[in-house]
Amino acid sequence: DAKIDSMFEYENYTTYKFQLSPPYNSNEPLHGYVIYANKIKTALKPIIHFPSAWAIGSNSDDWIINSTIKDFNYLLMEGYVVICPVYYSTYNRKKTLKTWWANDTEAYKNTIIKIGKDYKRSIDFIESRNEFDINDLSYMGYSWGSIMSNILLAIDDRVKSAFICAGGLQVQKSKPEIDPALYTRRITIPVMHITGKNDGIFDYENSQIPMQKLLGTPLEKQEMIVLDG
């Protein structure tokens, strides 16, 4: 039931908005944006993107297209297409989160579950598009997107690889249904993770290393790059 609208060319890129029925009871559609370079004539290699925590505080998604082109131009020009779903409780959708910080409330649990359902529904959309090579689907996330990868990469095996930056394993208590430590060990795909050893939020010893140790990916398919700073 995907609806495609607002397709237009922006300089050397094509972008469009998609809308889907959400996989849960809701009056608002799940929507998102697709961005790719016009020069690419072969099947596009899809990347499903998860935003930073800025998406929780923002009430508009107007800047997604411009920022994606600016930040990921090097990927677009290499034949990748970036898909940016507007997940539950982000941007201009109904807000049930005030922070990315985990807690053990039912409200937080239900929000994360809905985000996971939006993620899987968005992958359904990617799989339905003939111009995308679903067999080359990858995940990309920074900060909150890195944290959420602990759960998301474990719940859909159509994603074949992941690049995450900053983040780690959340140590705050949450409901067992969404405890990231129970999911991380189920991730088996290749993962590249770039972190900072002096990260003041995602501590190297208590967040970054535990995530790496729990990761179910074989060591030869993990690449953890730790920067000074």
Regions found by a protein language model. Name each.
Residues K120-Y183:
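Primarily recognizes the serine-hydrolase "nucleophile elbow" in alpha/beta-hydrolase
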Residues D179-P180, I189, D203-K213:
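Short alpha-helix in the alpha/beta-hydrolase fold that links the catalytic acid
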Residues I187, H193-T195, D199:
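Short beta-strand/loop motif that positions the catalytic acidic residue
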Residues I48-P51, P85-Y87, C165, L227:
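Alpha/beta-hydrolase
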Residues A2-T42:
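N-terminal cap/lid segment of alpha/beta-hydrolase-fold proteins
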Residues A53-K117, I123, S174:
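Cap/lid segment of the alpha/beta-hydrolase catalytic domain
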Residues Q208, Q212-G229:
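Catalytic histidine neighborhood in serine/cysteine hydrolases
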Residues H31-G32, A43-W54:
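Short beta-strand element of the alpha/beta-hydrolase
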